[in-house]
Regions:
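Amphipathic, small/basic residue-rich leader segments at the start of a protein or domain
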Residues: 1-86, 108, 112, 271-279, ...
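Glycine-rich phosphate/pyrophosphate-binding beta-alpha loops
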Residues: 129, 157-162, 205-206, 351-358
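A short, Trp-centered hydrophobic/proline-enriched beta-strand micro-motif
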Residues: 116-124, 170-171
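Internal helix-loop-helix
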Residues: 47-116, 161-167, 285, 299-306, ...
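Glycine-rich phosphate/cofactor-binding loops in nucleotide/flavin-utilizing enzymes
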Residues: 67, 71-72, 92, 238-239, ...
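A short core secondary-structure module
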Residues: 137, 148-198
Length: 376
């Protein structure tokens, strides 16, 4: 164990390096510019080794607890050097590849993601299958004459950053009509430039096209790109979703704190009348951070994350929406009348109770799997 495996020493070394390294983002605030800046930051972190700590050596990392990755995200996003969105794919998909891909494939591919050489996306949701993943219809069938290949047909939607991605972790339906849903899902690691794949960005109400529709028309994939065994896709998804609802939010929390500080600066001249409003936001953010710290400790102790991460997701959504609701109330007209950063972020925050699993689904998980309240 090296000195930098200790979180306090690691954070100090990272802060010193960031103070001496110019990673200032460009003035261009387009999504494409944000993605380019993220790759630039990732390459710099990887080359300086900070982006390799917290990841296992067998996948190009330098070992150490996962909390080191949280520290990197907090420092980078807290300084507004990169946006939190792309980090979500890194924190969700890299652990999945490490756990489920053939070791040789993980050793080849994961460093490309850590270095910023590639962006990956997650092909789970479909037009008729969002929170109910067991009902997906995108199908993978074995090639009729080449048994070591699969042919994929179907459609995915709400696929974040697919237009910038080189690879996709894709859930498909396999088996026959008699195969139970949870045993009929198989995951593949697919190259997005494979013939038959079409990516179409979707423009959302906050005027950013980070989500996409992805179509698969007779897409051929090598069986060696299967993640796990046939029918193991449901288990993969259940292992992945807790990371989607916890670790990938580390950077989001840092970003929300930075925006909270900005809100304080904008309203501090309004006097004591706003203190209670800001206090409620601080309490929500502080509660979220404490909960996230507990999740980080579980990871550091080697525990697998499970349904308890639904609590993290509920707290994040509540804190994010409260922050931007408070900004709307304390900055009259800024969100409604001005084309400002606050407006874009307020609109995006409306989806906080939807993306990554709806608030209703999260509360059902908490009720049934943590509190054992049953389905009544």
């Amino acid at each position: 164990m090296t000195e930098l495996h200790e979180p306090v020493a690691f954070r100090t070394a990272l802060q010193d390096w960031l103070d001496q390294t110019d990673l200032t983002p460009p003035e261009d605030h387009s999504l494409e510019a944000h993605m380019t800046q993220f790759r630039r930051v990732q390459r710099a972190l990887y080359d300086a080794d900070f982006g390799r700590y917290g990841w296992p050596e067998r996948a190009g990392g330098l070992g150490g607890p996962a909390v080191l990755r949280a520290i990197v995200g907090e420092e980078i996003v807290g300084r507004r050097l990169a946006e939190p969105g792309p980090y979500s794919m890194l924190e969700v998909l890299a652990p999945t590849m490490i756990d489920y891909a053939h070791p040789e494939l993980a050793a080849e591919m994961v460093p490309k993601l850590l270095r910023g050489d590639e962006q990956w996306c997650q092909g789970f949701s479909e037009p008729g299958s969002g929170s109910d993943l067991a009902s997906i219809t995108t199908r993978a069938t074995q090639h009729p004459t080449e048994g070591d290949r699969y042919i994929i047909n179907g459609q995915k939607v709400w696929t974040s950053f697919a237009q910038f991605s080189q690879r996709c972790i894709l859930l498909t339906r396999t088996g026959d009509a008699d195969t139970p849903d949870h045993q009929a899902i198989t995951a593949f690691f697919v190259d997005v430039d494979t013939p038959g794949i079409t990516v179409r960005p979707l423009r959302t109400m906050h005027d950013v096209d980070e989500f996409c529709e992805v179509y698969f028309d007779d897409v051929e994939v090598d069986a060696r790109r299967m993640l796990g065994k046939p029918g193991a896709g449901w288990r993969l998804a259940m292992d992945l979703l807790p990371y989607e609802r916890s670790t990938c939010f580390w950077q989001r929390i840092a970003y929300l704190y930075a925006r909270f500080d900005a809100l304080i600066e904008e309203v501090k001249r309004q006097g004591q009348a706003v203190d209670s409003d800001l206090g409620e936001v601080y309490l929500a953010l502080h509660t979220l951070r404490c909960r996230s710290a507990a999740t980080q400790r579980k990871l550091a102790e080697g525990h697998r994350l499970g349904p308890e991460t639904s609590i993290d997701k509920v707290l994040l959504a509540n804190a994010e929406q409260l922050l931007y609701d408070t900004a709307r109330n304390l900055l009259p007209g800024v969100i409604e009348l001005e084309n400002s950063e606050w407006r874009t972020e307020y609109l995006y925050s409306r989806a906080a109770t939807i993306y990554g699993g709806t608030a209703e689904v999260q509360r059902n998980i908490i009720a049934r799997r943590l509190l054992n309240l049953g389905k009544g």
